[in-house]
Curated annotation (Swiss-Prot):
Stated name of the protein: Serine/threonine-protein kinase SKM1
Record function comment: May be involved in cellular signaling or cytoskeletal functions. May play a role in morphogenetic control.
GO biological process: cellular response to starvation; intracellular signal transduction; negative regulation of gene expression; negative regulation of sterol import; negative regulation of transcription by RNA polymerase II; regulation of MAPK cascade; septum digestion after cytokinesis; sterol import
Organism: Saccharomyces cerevisiae (strain ATCC 204508 / S288c) (Baker's yeast)
EC number(s) given by UniProt: 2.7.11.1
GO molecular function terms listed in the Swiss-Prot or TrEMBL record: ATP binding; protein kinase activity; protein serine kinase activity; protein serine/threonine kinase activity
Gene label: SKM1
């Protein structure tokens, strides 16, 4: 068939009255459509044809083995069967669930769909765009005018209003530039940045207008119990409640069978944050929907806001207050640094080039991410002790110990440099508040196994998920201030170690703080970390998780290790209120608020002590020079309130 990009047999089902039925179909991806046929002849009308322009999200789920979900927008013009039309509203979102035969097929379909869908693959910046543009809001059409097409698409699906524009139009522009660059870097073809002279004029309030927003039923779509599993980095993430499917057996190694009934009962884990359980959310009141919506934001694992992990390399900026742009030479450097053979050779300075399967028994699958799967495992044999890479780590290893293993298919990773970066940093970072890297193995230059200490307490997010709610719908934290102070103090100790080595973590949040059964607190996930040098004492790369980002990153200014201090302050708010500021906003609106509002405020400041508020104030200074360093934070009275590890163990029982 002409224009076919990928085709093959799959099983699928759609949400609706007969959503329990899985049907075998021949799936064809071309330049414009995703078509489902009854046979591989494809000589008849497809059973279902989905325009690629309507696909808003694709994410892996565990509804079935080797399964992923496609979220698509629908309208009145779409051909929907009468029996299902009752369940769908105009401009709503619908899900299609697709199961493939093998893991490789699944990754192949995900890659192909991401590459062809315009709403997923990012939009490159306009080039040679130098004329003066009059940007504003037209009350007649209820939309923004005079903006580039890529920005118009973003604004149409965001909650940014004409009031936001009037209040701070420059912050809106900054949010748009950041969002587009953040999502579009991997598809940039060395284009120059948008070079626009914007005429920013205040807008008159229209008597009547309509802003195109996402509907509440789209955003508030999944229950808290399904919010599990972020494994974008090579570090392990633990899921204390779910036990997902095991990896299929292969010829030379047999994995332990794992019961999957619980997964089938509880449903999806890696779900699209805008799709799941629409029929359930329609039954919820506004208060309950608001609760669900706020937690869709926290684990935005496969959303359009974070489709790829960006490289840690960044151009230096001479002027701290000037806007930093991507330059061709920086992108060329990034491209050259991602040479697969060179990266694998560097990995082998840390990783052992042998098959590790005889050394471990994989007990159960603990998580699944874009880069690979995490398994809870048991060490059954020690590798050869004369290997210098094994001896270098100085970690005590014993047969029978439990470890976490991240398996990564290197051939399927678009940015191997990020994995190498994380591997090298972990190998060189031995400190009691940083998760221990034990060893790593490379199998035939194709697969990387990273062996880490097992933190059975899970991540801090698991504890925060155990919150109780008052009648007003507000969060009440399961942690008291003494426990919060202990977690923050231990995190500060880990950050002090990193900052002394001129390393910025750049992604501090509750998901990346792990605990063990003894109440010890450790930092994980070094995929975004970067090293400061004399040549580059400031960085400008747009990385991290947006809701925890410092304003200087959103404003695309140079930054240093104090971005970790800001994120630490946001994490403390997260512990107090159960979520970071603006989590109930769509990503673009959240970026605008970070750029516009400055230091976020507690919803109920009277609920915490003066010491806590003083600590937060020191962390959340917009002026970087006024923001405290980690070394300074360790002297604050708030941290003297810290409890003992034993007193934190009580909260670990919540999950």
């Amino acid at each position: 068939m002409k224009g076919v990009k990928k085709e093959g047999w799959i099983s699928y089902k759609v949400d609706g009255l007969f959503s329990f039925l899985w049907q075998k179909r021949y799936l064809v991806l071309n330049d414009s459509y995703l078509a489902f046929y009854k046979s591989d002849k494809c000589n008849e009308e497809p059973v279902l044809s989905v325009p690629l322009t309507s696909i808003t999200n694709v994410s892996r789920i565990q509804l079935k083995q080797n399964c992923f979900e496609i979220l698509r927008a629908t309208d009145q013009k779409e051909n929907i069967s009468p029996i299902n039309s009752y369940f769908y509203e105009s401009n709503s979102k619908r899900s299609i669930f697709i199961s493939t035969r093998t893991e490789r097929d699944l990754h192949g379909w995900l890659d192909a769909i991401f590459a062809k869908c315009p709403l997923l693959s990012g939009v490159s910046s306009p080039t040679n765009f130098t004329h003066k543009v009059h940007v504003g809001f037209d009350p007649k059409v209820g939309n923004f005018v005079g903006v580039p097409d890529s920005w118009a698409k973003l604004l149409q699906t965001s909650e940014i209003t004409y009031d936001d524009w009037n209040r701070n139009s420059k912050a809106v522009i900054k949010a748009l530039q950041f969002y587009e660059d953040y999502n579009g870097l991997d598809t940039m073809q060395f284009n120059d940045h948008l070079n626009t002279s914007l005429d920013l004029k205040p807008l008159k309030s229209p008597t009547r207008y309509i802003i195109n927003k996402r509907t509440n039923s789209i955003k508030r779509s999944v229950s808290r119990t399904l919010r599990k599993g972020k494994t974008d980095s090579i570090l392990p993430v633990y899921q204390s409640e779910l036990k997902p499917f095991p990896r299929p057996s292969d010829d030379d190694y047999k994995f332990t069978n794992i019961e999957d009934n619980k997964v089938r009962e509880e449903g999806r884990v890696h779900v699209s944050k805008e799709s799941t359980a629409d029929s359930q959310t329609k039954q919820l009141g506004k208060k309950e929907q608001k609760v669900i919506q706020s937690h869709l934001r926290r684990h935005d694992n496969n959303s359009t806001f974070r489709p790829h992990r960006l490289a840690p390399s960044a151009p230096a900026t001479k002027n701290h207050d000037s806007k930093t742009k991507w330059h061709k030479e920086d992108l060329l450097e990034l491209k050259n640094n991602d040479d697969s053979n060179e990266i694998i050779m560097k990995m082998k300075t840390v990783a052992i080039d042998v098959n590790p399967r005889p050394y471990f028994q994989l007990v159960e699958k603990a998580g699944q991410g874009a880069s690979g799967a995490v398994y809870l495992s048991k060490r059954i044999k020690l590798p050869q002790e004369n290997d210098p890479r094994f001896l270098k780590s100085h970690c005590h290893r014993v047969v029978g110990e439990r470890v976490a293993i991240k398996q990564i298919r290197l051939s399927e990773q678009p940015k191997k440099q990020l994995i190498m970066n994380e591997l090298l940093v972990m190998n060189d970072s031995r400190q009691e508040n940083i998760v221990n890297f034990l060893e790593a193995y490379i199998i035939d230059d194709e697969e990387l196994w990273v062996i880490m200490e097992y933190m059975e307490g899970g991540c801090l997010t698991d504890i925060l998920d155990a919150v109780a709610r008052s009648n007003t719908g507000e969060h009440s934290s399961p942690l008291n201030e003494n426990q919060m102070a202990y977690i923050v103090k231990e995190t500060c100790q880990g950050l002090k170690f990193l900052h002394n080595k001129k390393i910025i973590h750049r992604d501090i949040k509750s998901d990346n703080i792990l605990l063990n059964s003894q109440g010890l607190v450790k930092i994980t996930d070094f995929g975004f970390c970067v090293e400061l040098t004399e040549k580059r004492s400031k960085r400008a790369t747009m990385v991290g998780t947006p809701y925890w980002m410092a304003p200087e990153i959103v404003n695309q200014k140079g930054y240093d290790e104090k971005v970790d201090v800001w994120s630490l302050g946001i994490m403390l708010i997260e512990m107090i209120e159960g979520e970071p500021p603006y989590l109930n906003e769509d990503p673009l609106k959240a970026l605008y608020l970070i750029a516009n509002n400055g230091s976020p405020k507690l919803r109920h400041p009277e609920s915490v002590s003066k010491q806590t508020k003083q600590f937060l104030d020191a962390c959340l200074q917009v002026n970087v020079e006024s923001r405290a360093s980690v070394r300074k934070l360790l002297t604050f009275e708030f941290l003297s309130m810290a409890c003992s590890p034993e007193q934190l163990k009580v909260s670990l029982k919540w999950h």
